[in-house]
């Protein structure tokens, strides 16, 4: 059989087995990113393209949208954000690149000087850079990246909320928070920070979360006089101390540490919540009551998983109710019956 006969036979088989291709209305993979924005009006102010496997900003033709204020591209496959340069510098205020594959913060981000919110969480970023011109920025999110150093933030005078949980930060440097006097919330959970140091620039800080680190001591918080919520769970702290100046505290979380006694808290008259489950607290109920007697606003206490609870299971709730202030409403997530 010659070559032509083989080809003819093959063509006949192909014809007999020809399959009609039907376009998938819900494809697993978007082959043309440009189609995602082609029907949007040029004057649109908000673009939200989530979980669409977008790889390239260039193909979205973002230069068309001169009035764009918010751009959300969460859960895509974007590696480069240099194309943000084409966004309207005087209009764009909110950029969200949560859960992509970004490794570097492009210098073009620095041109978007009206930004108030920037979310780069769940990416592959190693260095904080190219943000110094974003002086209107109020919210900055870097959760779950590979950042090892808190740096290059000193010009962000408007910053109120900074999230750096789930990174590789090993220490707080002397200049880490320099210039951030308006910062109100900072989230540093799941890093490897060994000490509470160099926090003094944060005069207006209200929430400090530094859970799941390597802390052994509560210290150097005396200048954080506006602090209202302090989250220190899953560390290696052995004693409650160093809170003499933090008189506005309403919530203290020391869950899963190595604390043996609730003490040095009676001066915190605004305290409503003490979370201290899974420590080594074994003091008497009378001692506990004395140490917390002045907390007239205390509403909630968590002590489960401590010797004081494990060794007094039948009388535990009753004795706590008897010895703690009458303002108490909840013990270990269960309300006290009236």
UniProtKB/Swiss-Prot annotation:
A single MF term (Gene Ontology): protein phosphatase activator activity
UniProt keywords, alphabetically: Cell cycle, Cell division, Leucine-rich repeat, Mitosis, Nucleus, Phosphoprotein, Repeat
Cited InterPro entries: Cilia_flagella_integrity, Leu-rich_rpt, Leu-rich_rpt_4, Leu-rich_rpt_typical-subtyp, LRR_dom_sf
Domain LRRCT: 306-338
Top-level division of the source organism's lineage: Eukaryota
Subunit description: Interacts with YPI1.
Similarity remark: Belongs to the SDS22 family.
Other remarks on this protein: Present with 3870 molecules/cell in log phase SD medium.
Protein name as it appears in the record: Protein phosphatase 1 regulatory subunit SDS22
Lineage: Eukaryota, Fungi, Dikarya, Ascomycota, Saccharomycotina
Gene giving rise to this polypeptide: SDS22
